[in-house]
Amino acid sequence: MTTILGLTCISEQLKDKDKKEYSFRTMTRKRFNDLCNNEGRDEAIKELSNRILHNVVVTESIVYHCAKSNIGHYRLSSALFPLVTDETLEISLDELPDIQQIQEELKQVGDTAREYGISMGSHPDQFNVLASTNPDAVRRTIGELNMQASVLDMIGLPQDHTAPMNIHINYTPKMDETFEIV
């Protein structure tokens, strides 16, 4: 039996080399709104776009690191595209000034993974709850899952079991009232 090693989201070895270069960058809603209020929405979008591009470049470095380290699977960070699915901010990928370069870099991530035989998948954050009794939570979860699927598509991963998206249902006994047992 062959054992395939996998890496989840972040390479501590790369971060030890250069924490600033190899760390994912996020952005809070507060920071985005502060930028909008102080410098305008265009500047906030520009900063967000820059951070997303950085995250995608870091992902490319991590996939290449996996290849050099004999790691056969990489699970994408769910933080590649911060705030993009926040409905209150109404951000479209098309308005990101770096979207073309982001898409090209994501394609390169996929090309590198294929070249070195590295499988990839994703694991959306725990706040995504498909089994919620709250319709708004389910709607937001579907939006997040669609975004994650779009990223997998932009990378060029197959739409099958070889590029899994790990989704937790978050079942609790109270849900017995909601779901019919099949």
Question: Over which residues does each language-model region extend?
Answer:
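Alpha/beta catalytic barrel-like cores
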Residues: 1-118, 128-131, 136-139, 154-157
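Conserved, mostly hydrophobic/aromatic
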Residues: 123
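Eukaryote-skewed repeat-based solenoidal scaffolds used as protein-protein interaction platforms
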Residues: 139, 145-182
